[in-house]
């Protein structure tokens, strides 16, 4: 630590003073000091995976690290916020300022509402280092869509072992007599579901080189594929031998034919009455479950229709009674 401090001091004295002055001027302008968070945030690993995938794809397409922007969706109950999913946003740069494509956002929001009706827009995310004035500029645009949005920033280039994710909320502070928007960092916890735990466990078992060839799932599938491929080649060889024996192309070898016959009898017999009964029972159970789900969905739709009809009928009845009082 002392060596790092000495190196920083030497850099500051050899021409890096202007950069340090800029950093010192930038950090206070976007971060609020001594402000505690007003909400509790629970972050799902799926969001982090989505952001990482978004950044990696864009880096592969552009050939260099780029900043990505997206939306955060989830649930909010009072002061408790649960960030459960995310989707990408389009943006373009005008005079070195990032402008969000709001029409694209509204289109994506409508699509997500059709699938995830219970989720709502909570904020936005981006990638990079500490927050800067450009993040404030984008945050103000998001504030036009939703009041008090969250801001999540992931730093994919960090070398630290801790999770490089920070969550912020915006506060308004008076600086030099003017109302200024600043960021206040929030503490968050990780919340997982069963499907997420399986996916995260698979990612955690990947090798440090980033290759998926040595993952547990890949090794299991490769072993199964090799076994099935070998079985197919052996069965094909036996079938060709039997056909050649029947055609008289090769002499009969009764020992090999007996082994092939015994192998065929080792296979389960699927033409018994018990198998047919169990098979049809299982088909009926699956069909009944699907039919029950359809009936439940239909009843729910009919119930909503009846409720709306009753509300409309009551309003019309009130209108008729009101007209009867005046005529």
Curated annotation (Swiss-Prot):
Cellular location(s): Nucleus; Cytoplasm; Cytoplasm, Perinuclear region
Keyword annotations of the record: Cytoplasm, Host-virus interaction, Nucleus, Signalosome
Record keyword Cytoplasm present: yes
GO BP: protein deneddylation; protein neddylation; regulation of protein neddylation
Record domain MPN: where: 41-174
Main location: nucleus
Keyword Nucleus: yes
Domain of life: Eukaryota
InterPro entries: EIF3F/CSN6-like_C, JAMM/MPN+_dom, MPN, MPN_CSN6
CC per GO annotation: COP9 signalosome; cytoplasm; cytosol; nucleoplasm; nucleus; perinuclear region of cytoplasm
Tissues where the protein occurs: Widely expressed.
Residue numbers spanned by region Interaction with Vpr: 211-327
Pfam families named in the record: JAB, MitMem_reg
Primary role: Component of the COP9 signalosome complex (CSN), a complex involved in various cellular and developmental processes. The CSN complex is an essential regulator of the ubiquitin (Ubl) conjugation pathway by mediating the deneddylation of the cullin subunits of SCF-type E3 ligase complexes, leading to decrease the Ubl ligase activity of SCF-type complexes such as SCF, CSA or DDB2. The complex is also involved in phosphorylation of p53/TP53, c-jun/JUN, IkappaBalpha/NFKBIA, ITPK1 and IRF8, possibly via its association with CK2 and PKD kinases.
SUBUNIT field: Component of the CSN complex, composed of COPS1/GPS1, COPS2, COPS3, COPS4, COPS5, COPS6, COPS7 (COPS7A or COPS7B), COPS8 and COPS9 isoform 1. In the complex, it probably interacts directly with COPS2, COPS4, COPS5, COPS7 (COPS7A or COPS7B) and COPS9 isoform 1. Interacts with the translation initiation factor EIF3S6. Interacts weakly with RBX1. Directly interacts with COP1 and 14-3-3 protein sigma/SFN. Interacts with ERCC6. (Microbial infection) Interacts with the HIV-1 protein Vpr.
Family, similarity comment: Belongs to the peptidase M67A family. CSN6 subfamily.
Protein name: COP9 signalosome complex subunit 6
Species, as recorded: Homo sapiens
High-level lineage: Eukaryota, Metazoa, Chordata, Craniata, Vertebrata
Gene from which this protein is expressed: COPS6
């Amino acid at each position: 630590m002392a060596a790092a401090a000495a190196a920083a001091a030497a850099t500051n004295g050899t021409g890096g003073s202007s950069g340090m002055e800029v950093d010192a001027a930038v950090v206070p302008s976007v971060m609020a000091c001594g402000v505690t968070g007003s909400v509790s945030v629970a972050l799902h690993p799926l969001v982090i995976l989505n952001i990482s995938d978004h950044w990696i794809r864009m880096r592969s397409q552009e050939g260099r690290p780029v900043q990505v922007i997206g939306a955060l969706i989830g649930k909010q109950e009072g002061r408790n916020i649960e960030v459960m999913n995310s989707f990408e946003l389009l943006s373009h740069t005008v005079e070195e300022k990032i402008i969000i494509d709001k029409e694209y956002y509204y289109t994506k929001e409508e699509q997500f509402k059709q699938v995830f009706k219970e989720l709502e827009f909570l904020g936005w995310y981006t990638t990079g280092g500490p927050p800067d004035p450009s993040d404030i500029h984008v945050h103000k645009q998001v504030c036009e869509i939703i009041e008090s949005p969250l801001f999540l920033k992931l730093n994919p280039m960090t070398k630290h072992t801790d999770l490089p994710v920070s969550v912020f909320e915006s506060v308004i502070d008076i600086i030099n007599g003017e109302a200024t928007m600043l960021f206040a960092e929030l503490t968050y916890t990780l919340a997982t579901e069963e499907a997420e735990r399986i996916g995260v466990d698979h990612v955690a078992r990947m090798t440090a080189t980033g290759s998926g060839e040595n993952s547990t799932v890949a090794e299991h599938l490769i072993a199964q594929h090799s076994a099935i491929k070998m079985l197919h080649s052996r069965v094909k060889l036996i079938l060709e031998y039997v056909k050649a024996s029947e055609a008289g192309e090769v002499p009969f070898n009764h020992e090999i034919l007996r082994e092939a016959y015994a192998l065929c009898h080792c296979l389960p017999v699927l033409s018994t009455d018990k198998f047919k009964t169990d098979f049809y029972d299982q088909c009926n159970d699956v069909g009944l479950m699907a039919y029950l789900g359809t009936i439940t969905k239909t009843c729910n739709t009919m119930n909503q229709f009846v409720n709306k009809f009753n509300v409309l009928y009551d309003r019309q009845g009130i209108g008729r009674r009101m007209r009867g009082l005046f005529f």
